[in-house]
C-alpha cells in the first residue's frame, strides 16, 4: 500500500496524504486533484477502490497497429498532445507480432474504465477480420473514433484521407509524365482503404481487368519488394503504392531487377512519413493531413465523452501530392 501511495502521489504531483484521502473518498480535495489522482492510478495499472470503479477515468486509449511505420508515431504525437491539452491522459497501445493483440488491449482498456478509444489502422480496416471486440465497445456505450476507412457495419465516427482523391493525384501526376503502363501495390485483399484506392484507379484508368497491373502485399518492405518486382517484370513504368513503406519496397525491387528509379521506373508513395525527404531518391508521395485528422479525431471523441451527439459518419480530408525525386518522365519521353 505504501509503495502504491508513493508512486501515485509522484505521478499525480500531490502528497501521499492527498492520495489517501481520494482513495478513501474523503472530503477536502478539489475535483481537479481528485481527477489527477484517479488518472495516475489508472495509468500506473492499479485497480481503483470498489466504490470508485463505476466512474470512468479521464484516460483515453490510442490503439495502433505498430510503431515501425513512421506515420503512426506521427499520428500518436498529434493525438496524445491534443488529448493532454483537453485534460485527458492518453494510454498508447501498440501491437507487436506475437505480443498483445488488439482484442487484448480492448479488454485492458475496459478494465481501466477508459473514457474512450481512438483506433488507427486496426482490424476494423480488414473486411475478413474479427470485429467482436469493437461491438463490445458499442455494447458498453463507450465513445470510439476510427482513423481511416473501416468496414461500414461498425458504425463508428471516422476521420479518413480521401483515398479516391489520393489516387487521382498520383495517377494524374504519372500520366502527365507520359507513363501509360501504371501499376499498383496495395494492401491485403480485404483491406478497405486499398479497396477504395483500387476502385478509384479502375475508374481513372478505365480498367476492365486489373490483374496485370495490381499486386497485393502485407504492409512490409519485403512484401512490397516481391509484389512490385512482378509489376516491373511485366513492363510497368509507374507504380502507385498504398503506403510509403510499400513504395520503398518497390524502389528496392526495381533496383534488384537492374532498373533505375526514376529513369526507368517511377514510384509514388502514400502517407508522406517522416524521413521521406532523406530516401534515395527522395520519395514522391501523397501526403495524409495527419495533424488535421488527429485533431479532428480527438474533437469527435471528446464531444462524445462530454455527452453531445456526433454524426456516426465519415469525415474525408483531402490529401496533397508532394513531388520529389522518385518520379520522372516515362522512358523514351
Which residues does each PLM region occupy?
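Central regulatory/effector-binding core of bacterial HTH transcription factors
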Residues: 81-127
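N-terminal helix-turn-helix/winged-helix DNA-binding helices
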Residues: 41-77, 86, 96-97, 108-111
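Bacterial carbohydrate/catabolite-sensing allosteric modules
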Residues: 43, 81-86, 113, 135-333
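N-terminal helix-turn-helix DNA-binding module of bacterial transcription factors
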Residues: 1-58, 331-333
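Short, flexible, glycine-rich and Lys/Arg-enriched loop motifs at helix boundaries
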Residues: 49-57, 121-133
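Short histidine/acidic/glycine/proline-rich micro-motifs that form metal-
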Residues: 66-68, 96-97, 122-126, 188-192
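Short gly/ser/thr-rich secondary-structure transition/capping motifs
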Residues: 42-47, 100, 126-128, 251
Amino acid at each position: 500500500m505504501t509503495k502504491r501511495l508513493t508512486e501515485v502521489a509522484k505521478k499525480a504531483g500531490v502528497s501521499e496524504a492527498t492520495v489517501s484521502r481520494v482513495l478513501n473518498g474523503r472530503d477536502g480535495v478539489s475535483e481537479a486533484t481528485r481527477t489527477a489522482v484517479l488518472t495516475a492510478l489508472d495509468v500506473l495499472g492499479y485497480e481503483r477502490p470498489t466504490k470508485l470503479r463505476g466512474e470512468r477515468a479521464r484516460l483515453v486509449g490510442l490503439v495502433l497497429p505498430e510503431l515501425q511505420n513512421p506515420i503512426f508515431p506521427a499520428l500518436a504525437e498529434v493525438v496524445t498532445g491534443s488529448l493532454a491539452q483537453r485534460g485527458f491522459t492518453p494510454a498508447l497501445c501498440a501491437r507487436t507480432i506475437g505480443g498483445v493483440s488488439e482484442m487484448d488491449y480492448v479488454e485492458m482498456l475496459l478494465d481501466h474504465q477508459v473514457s474512450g478509444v481512438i483506433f488507427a489502422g486496426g482490424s476494423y480496416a480488414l473486411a475478413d477480420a474479427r470485429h467482436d471486440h469493437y461491438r463490445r465497445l458499442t455494447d458498453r456505450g463507450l465513445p470510439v473514433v476510427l482513423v481511416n476507412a473501416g468496414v461500414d457495419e461498425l458504425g463508428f465516427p471516422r476521420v479518413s484521407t480521401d483515398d479516391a482523391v489520393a489516387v487521382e493525384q498520383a495517377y494524374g501526376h504519372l500520366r502527365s509524365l507520359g507513363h501509360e503502363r501504371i501499376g499498383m501495390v496495395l494492401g491485403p485483399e480485404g483491406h478497405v482503404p486499398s479497396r477504395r484506392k483500387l476502385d478509384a484507379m479502375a475508374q481513372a484508368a478505365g480498367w476492365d481487368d486489373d490483374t496485370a497491373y495490381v499486386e497485393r502485399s502485407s504492409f512490409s518492405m519485403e512484401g512490397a519488394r516481391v509484389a512490385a518486382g512482378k509489376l516491373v517484370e511485366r513492363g510497368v513504368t509507374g507504380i502507385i503504392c498504398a503506403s510509403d513503406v510499400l513504395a520503398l519496397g518497390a524502389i528496392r525491387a526495381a533496383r534488384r531487377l537492374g532498373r533505375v528509379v526514376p529513369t526507368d521506373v517511377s514510384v509514388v508513395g502514400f502517407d508522406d512519413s517522416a524521413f521521406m525527404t532523406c530516401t534515395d531518391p527522395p520519395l514522391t508521395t501523397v501526403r495524409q493531413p495527419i495533424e488535421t485528422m488527429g485533431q479532428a479525431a480527438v474533437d469527435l471523441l471528446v464531444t462524445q465523452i462530454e455527452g453531445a451527439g456526433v454524426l456516426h459518419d465519415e469525415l474525408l480530408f483531402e490529401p496533397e501530392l508532394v513531388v520529389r525525386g522518385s518520379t520522372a518522365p516515362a522512358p523514351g519521353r
